[in-house]
Swiss-Prot record:
It comes from Acidithiobacillus ferrooxidans (strain ATCC 23270 / DSM 14882 / CIP 104768 / NCIMB 8455). Pfam families: BRCT (PF00533), DNA_ligase_aden (PF01653), DNA_ligase_OB (PF03120), DNA_ligase_ZBD (PF03119), HHH_2 (PF12826), HHH_5 (PF14520), Nlig-Ia (PF22745). NCBIfam families: dnlj, PRK07956.1. This is DNA ligase. PANTHER family: CHROMOSOME TRANSMISSION FIDELITY FACTOR 18, DNA LIGASE. Signal peptide: none annotated. Zn(2+) binds at residues 410, 413, 428, 434. The gene is ligA.
Length: 671
């Protein structure tokens, strides 16, 4: 009989309780009980204990918010009760007309209403069975949405298990996923520093974060969820909207504190004006108020139109919008090579701030809005966020304007500009050479999983580039003690240690070197596959996209990216300089006779006889590769205890599944 480690079990229960309480205090009471560092330390400890004791892992543990393996495409979620949108009004007359229709439909003037902020985010339906979160989906067309369950599970104020009592066996909660304005600014700052396109507004940031195929990315985004309604329920939830929202709060949801009961027109307008005055200081973007008939029986009497309920209306705030002229459109190159069109605007005051530039994001956005130099445009600045060109006023377009097109050559380094399939961004392909990408390329090259040059961190890279000592990654190998000692906080001993690290990195492996080059779409796993297939760098550099696609986990997008990278003369020059500086590796000998030679396996669920990392190492030693997601190219899916959705997807695709015993037996089989 297996002995239970009571100490671990008790600590797991204690940590879960502390983390759930900390989440409630942070999100629902605005009174944090743990610092971020303390929270993270407890979460790490809990994850370690659960890994050590997989029999006590639970779907509602706080550790399950960190994200699941990436998916290739979102599944579908179907709604028995449509997830409808709302009709909008934009002034007092429009609101007054709506209220009059409601009063007429109910045959009385005294109609209690609820009023709450209209959060500017992404609508999501969350389904609970017996109190456990089992599914989450986006609005979609109202009947069918995208399955974003794994991503919603990472949102820290979404209860994975309902709290309190008397919750129904089946419950669908509907609400809005949003991102705080302060977090939005931080996120955009990080994206700009990384050379990525900034999000246009918090709504786009929330939607983009929630619709990540890799839920571990979503887990890093500070999203929040505010319920505003419900869908299916196995029992009636209450007699009024406000009463139901109070029950949702008791069950663990963060219900907005700005929910109010209001009655006649004057009171509604007064609350609308109050909220309009404080909206700029609110932690979340709101673009109006939603007024609803509070009584649920009265709602049934009013019913729905073809697209929206008659018993609710969105009363929108006026937007901060002004007209100005596009004086130029520039192609701006970010640190990762993404080229972003930027509109240079005739300076204009929008919401109290002078706006002279606005990101146009990508070529698709320019084409969709048909923005040209010389156009008069409407510029919006909703709250304190990045300005956005809303639309072109085409009646005022000057004659002889021309559509804007992305340059074919990088405006900074002259390398080829390429747009990969399934991407909206154009990129400069001169990643090793382009000055705009220099800092990012050097940091990545020196990182632990690449060339592993310890001591060559971000601040030192900034100094090396700023002082003109390093222009490409090859220049790292020409640094000397005298040059380094001229930098801030760099004494002789520190310089000698760094030079020793640089010298050590000259002897590397081909997979590390390929990963260090920073080729778009090439991570560590793909770098290893390329190295095993080609054995050395020269045949890889000469490979065509067609040849590259012979590698099991290399599709057309990766093949195109690799081929174009090595086709750039500037990149080839830097690689030649690295080799001339003594960077070298052993030729990779293809693994022969491995049981999983050339195969791709996926692991799901907990294994009894080995950890997941041990299983991965065993597969790689047998010539195989471990992937995080199931596709038609997957050879086997190894299914352990409590498997996730990967097993279901394997069944749908006809991919063979192995039990742990079958998997282990294959190592002793002859090929």
């Amino acid at each position: 009989m297996e002995r239970v480690n009571h100490t671990d079990f008790e600590r797991i229960q204690q940590l879960r309780a502390e983390l759930v309480a900390a989440n409630n205090a942070y999100y629902r009471e605005d009174s944090p009980t743990l610092s971020d560092a303390e929270y993270d330390a407890r979460l790490r400890e809990l994850r370690t204990l659960e890994d050590r004791n997989p029999q006590w892992q639970s779907a509602d543990s706080p550790t399950q918010r960190v994200g699941a393996a990436p998916v290739e495409v979102f599944g579908e979620v179907h709604y028995a009760i449509p997830l409808t949108s709302l009709d909008n009004v934009f002034d007092q007359d429009g609101f007054s007309d709506w209220l009059a229709r409601v009063q007429k439909g109910l045959g009385r003037e005294d109609v209690p209403l609820s009023a709450e902020p209209k959060f500017d985010g992404l609508s999501v339906n969350i389904r609970y069975i017996e109190g456990k979160l089992v599914q989450a989906g986006t609005r979609g067309d109202g009947q069918t949405g995208e399955d974003v369950t794994a991503n919603v599970r990472t949102i820290r104020n979404v209860p994975l298990q309902l709290t309190g009592k008397d919750w129904p066996e089946l419950l669908e909660v509907r609400g809005e996923v949003v991102i705080p304005v302060a977090a939005f600014r931080r996120l955009n700052g990080e994206r700009l520093r990384a050379g990525d396109n900034p999000f246009a507004n918090p709504r786009n940031a929330a939607a983009g974060s929630l619709r990540q195929l890799d839920s571990s990315v979503t887990a890093k985004r500070p999203l929040a969820y505010f319920p505003w309604g419900w869908g299916e329920s196995s029992v009636p939830l209450g007699k009024s909207h406000i009463a139901v929202m109070e029950r949702l709060s008791a069950w663990g949801f963060e219900v907005t504190s700005y929910l109010r009961g209001v009655h006649e027109l004057t009171e509604c307008q007064r609350y609308f004006s109050e909220m309009q005055k404080i909206r700029e200081g609110m932690p979340f973007e709101i673009d109006g108020l939603v007024f609803k008939v509070d009584d649920l029986l009265a709602r049934e009497q009013l019913g729905f139109t073809a697209r929206a309920p008659r018993w609710a209306i969105a009363y929108k705030f006026p937007a901060h919008e002004e007209r100005t002229v596009v004086e130029d459109i520039l192609a701006s190159v970010g640190r990762t090579g993404v080229i972003t069109p930027v509109a240079v605007l005739k300076p204009v005051q929008v919401g109290g701030v002078t706006v002279s530039r606005a990101s146009l994001h990508n070529q698709d956005e320019v084409d969709r809005k048909d923005i040209r130099v010389g156009d008069t445009v409407l510029v919006r600045r909703a709250g304190d966020v990045i300005p956005e060109v809303v639309m072109v006023i085409k009646e005022e377009r000057p004659p002889a304007t021309q559509p804007w097109h992305m340059p074919q050559r990088c405006p900074v380094c002259g390398s080829e500009v390429l747009r990969l399939a399934n991407e909206s961004a154009h990129r400069c392909m001169g990643g090793l050479y382009c000055p705009a990408q220099r800092m990012g390329a050097i940091r990545h090259f020196a990182s632990r999983r690449a060339m592993d040059i310890r001591g060559l961190g971000e601040k030192l890279v900034e100094q090396l580039v700023g002082h003109g000592l390093v222009h490409t990654v090859a220049d790292i190998y020409h640094l000397d003690e005298a040059a380094l000692c001229g930098l801030e906080r760099m004494a002789s001993r520190s310089a000698q240690k760094l030079l020793a690290e640089i010298d050590r990195s000259r002897h590397t492996s081909l997979p590390r070197f390929l990963y260090a080059l920073g080729i778009r779409q090439v991570g560590e796993g793909t770098a290893k596959s390329l190295a095993i297939y080609f054995g050395d760098l020269d045949p890889l550099m000469a490979a065509t996209p067609e040849l590259l696609q012979n590698i099991p986990d290399v599709g057309p997008i990766v093949a195109e990216s690799v081929a174009h990278f090595f086709a750039q003369p500037h990149n080839r020059d830097v690689i030649a300089a690295l080799r001339a500086a003594g960077v070298q590796w052993a030729v990779v000998q293809p693994q022969k006779g491995g049981r999983f030679q050339g195969m791709t396996l996926v692991l799901t669920g907990a294994l009894d006889n080995m950890t997941r990392e041990e299983a991965k190492t065993a597969i790689e030693n047998a010539g195989g590769k471990v992937s995080g997601s199931v596709s038609a190219k997957t050879s086997y899916v190894v299914v352990g205890k409590d498997p996730g959705s990967k097993a279901e997807k394997a069944a749908k695709l006809g991919v063979k599944q192995l039990t742990e015993a079958q998997f282990l037996a294959m190592f002793s089989e002859k090929e």
